[in-house]
């Protein structure tokens, strides 16, 4: 299932969640990105490369370097995060390990220079200047509105969590040894210049982060220098290292990453448990007990043969399944993603408003990109029977300040009987629909459905 990124720090004291603080410029540059839709945002994000070209030739295949000589775009990138922003952030309470890592690459290894507890800007700047340490700031979208705006749209576009980290490295220094990641990475160069070397993956589309020794990675397949306004993409598993050239100002870049634990293998793991449960209800062969002392045996050839037969049976059943059960992936995504970008009073966003829907109303879905529909198990606490329900999860009330920080999160949404699925799909697949036309048996059920969705701010009367 998708996992929330956890800061890889050694700070012992985590401290309370930082207060929300604005570090925006009083009058920032206008955005060159298109925020009208998720697809429009991504198209402008990788411009001038076309989206179709990107997914056909680069996505999960090879790196893409976009070097732009565009002063307006460079100015916009610089506004996303600056070294100078750290001073105001430190004054609001950020902590080593949770929010900030301070590190250097020493003899091919990462050396963490974190202090304990709260970060003080003067100490941070001293380590940066005197120890030539790299400052890694975790999940800056918690504080920077424009990064929130970008990443929220990217989460809608990819249907996967999107995290970010800022790296600020002084001249003539390198923060991290050669390594590869378990995420798809987009790098935006914000300040200064950064010299990059990319290498052939030893584990294509890697599922885990790993450091690689210099003597194992061979010669670079790509070598270049990023300047403000440039963008770099590379697939998970791509070995890389980067340094700030001597004699120049510091470098600041942000990595925007996605698709952690979002492979077909992850999706299969998420689906298979529900499929086995449903099949076992209908097929006595799966409910039969395993042979005596099976767990004590060393040989497993006969067992493997029996299991392969069950898997073939499950495959046959899967092809005819109308609704795929999801154990965690959909819920986890809805619970942990960013809330909709909204600069007004957030209370208005999550409070139902407008006309109350009735049987004669026409309604339409709101926040379509922030809602997931799934079928999952439900156990009645009164009689301990287990069945299936339709779950509607949304991210309207999610907390921006804990996004991708590994915190326990609360799920928001609704639960309906399985018989409501067709009516829910009607609402999902229509630009607008009459409540009377919903595929439910009684008018009471129709009103119950739309009132429940309206209360959660998921539909409006048109």
Curated annotation (Swiss-Prot):
GO biological process entries: ribosome biogenesis
Record has rRNA-binding as a keyword: no
Enzyme Commission number, as recorded: 1.14.11.79
Domain JmjC: 139-271
Requisite cofactors: Fe(2+)
GO molecular function, one term: histone H3K4 demethylase activity
TM annotation in the entry: none
Cross-referenced PANTHER family: MINA53 MYC INDUCED NUCLEAR ANTIGEN, RIBOSOMAL OXYGENASE 2
This protein's name: Ribosomal oxygenase 2
Gene that produces this protein: RIOX2
């Amino acid at each position: 299932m998708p996992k929330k990124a956890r800061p890889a720090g050694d700070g012992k004291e985590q401290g309370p969640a930082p207060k929300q603080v604005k570090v925006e410029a009083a009058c920032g540059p206008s955005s060159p990105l298109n925020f009208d839709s998720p697809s429009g945002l991504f198209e402008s994000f990788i411009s001038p490369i076309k989206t179709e070209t990107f997914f056909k030739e680069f996505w999960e295949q090879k790196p893409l370097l976009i070097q732009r000589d565009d002063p307006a775009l460079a100015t916009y990138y610089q506004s996303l995060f600056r070294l100078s922003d750290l001073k105001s952030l430190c004054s609001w309470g950020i902590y080593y390990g949770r929010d900030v890592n301070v590190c250097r690459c020493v003899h091919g290894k990462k050396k963490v220079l974190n202090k304990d507890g709260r970060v003080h800007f003067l100490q941070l700047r001293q380590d940066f200047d005197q120890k030539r340490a790299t400052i890694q700031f975790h999940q800056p979208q918690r504080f920077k509105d424009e990064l929130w705006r970008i990443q929220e749209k990217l989460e809608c576009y990819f249907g996967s969590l999107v995290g970010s980290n800022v790296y600020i490295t002084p001249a003539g220094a390198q923060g991290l040894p050669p390594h590869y990641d378990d995420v798809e990475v987009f790098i935006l160069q914000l300040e200064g210049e950064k010299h990059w070397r990319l290498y052939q993956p030893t584990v294509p589309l890697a599922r885990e982060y790993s450091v690689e020794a210099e003597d194992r990675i061979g010669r670079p397949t790509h070598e270049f220098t990023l300047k403000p306004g440039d963008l770099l993409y590379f697939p998970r598993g791509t070995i890389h290292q980067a340094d700030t050239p001597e004699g120049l100002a510091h470098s600041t870049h942000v990595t925007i990453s996605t698709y952690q634990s979002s492979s077909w293998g992850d999706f299969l793991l998420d689906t298979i448990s529900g499929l086995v449960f449903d099949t076992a209800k209908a097929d006595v062969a799966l409910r039969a007990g395993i042979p005596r002392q099976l767990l004590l045996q060393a040989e497993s050839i006969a067992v493997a043969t029996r299991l392969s037969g069950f898997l073939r049976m499950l495959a046959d059943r899967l092809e005819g399944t109308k609704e795929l059960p999801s154990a965690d992936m959909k819920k986890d995504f809805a619970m942990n993603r960013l809330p909709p970008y909204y600069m007004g009073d957030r209370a208005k966003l999550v409070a139902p408003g407008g006309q109350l829907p009735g049987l004669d109303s026409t309604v339409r879905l709101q926040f379509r990109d922030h809602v997931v529909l799934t079928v999952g198990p439900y156990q009645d606490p009164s009689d301990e029977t287990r069945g299936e329900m339709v779950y509607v999860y949304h991210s309207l009330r999610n907390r921006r300040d804990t996004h991708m920080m590994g915190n326990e999160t609360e799920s928001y949404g609704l639960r309906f009987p399985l018989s409501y699925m067709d009516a829910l799909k009607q609402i999902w697949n229509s630009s607008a629909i009459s409540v009377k036309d919903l595929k439910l048996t009684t008018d009471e059920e129709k009103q119950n459905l739309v009132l429940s969705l309206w209360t959660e701010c998921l539909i409006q009367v048109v």
